[in-house]
Regions:
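Alpha4 helix (beta4-alpha4-beta5 surface) of REC/receiver domains from two-component response regulators
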Residues: 82-98
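Non-catalytic signal-transmission and effector/linker regions of two-component phosphorelay proteins
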Residues: 1-10
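C-terminal output helix
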Residues: 104-113
Length: 119
């Protein structure tokens, strides 16, 4: 497998929530993958385009930076608590295929992350 292919297969994590980041990094390590972290600018646009899976922390939904990104498959919003209605609306707006609430959805997210790592 080439380096370019390996880099493209990395999941993207977008969040500034340190507790959520710790949980996601642990979970992604268990899935056998190392994510790319980005919060804005050209790095976010490139990583969003190339990532095998995009994990958006619920904290990232409130910023306008995600609105400029094109919709794509493989976007999951991740939160440490159930989302309020405005959070669900924002998840729909960014085209999320699912909202995963940790720790309840950890097994599903682990499976989804492992599957994306094989792409």
């Amino acid at each position: 497998m080439s380096t370019a292919r390996t880099a493209a297969a990395r999941p993207l994590v977008v969040s500034a929530d340190e507790e959520l980041l710790d949980d996601l990094l642990r979970l992604l390590a268990a899935a056998g993958t190392e994510p790319e972290l980005a919060t804005g600018g050209p790095a976010l646009r490139r990583a969003h385009r190339d990532a095998s899976l995009v994990l958006l922390g619920s904290d990232a939904l409130t910023g306008g930076v995600l609105r400029a990104l094109p919709r794509r498959p493989g976007v999951v919003v991740v939160s440490g608590r159930p989302l309020p209605p405005i959070g669900w609306a924002a998840a729909v707006e960014v085209g999320a295929e699912r909202v995963a609430v940790l720790p309840e959805d950890e097994a599903w997210l682990l499976s989804r992350s492992a599957a994306a790592a094989k792409i």
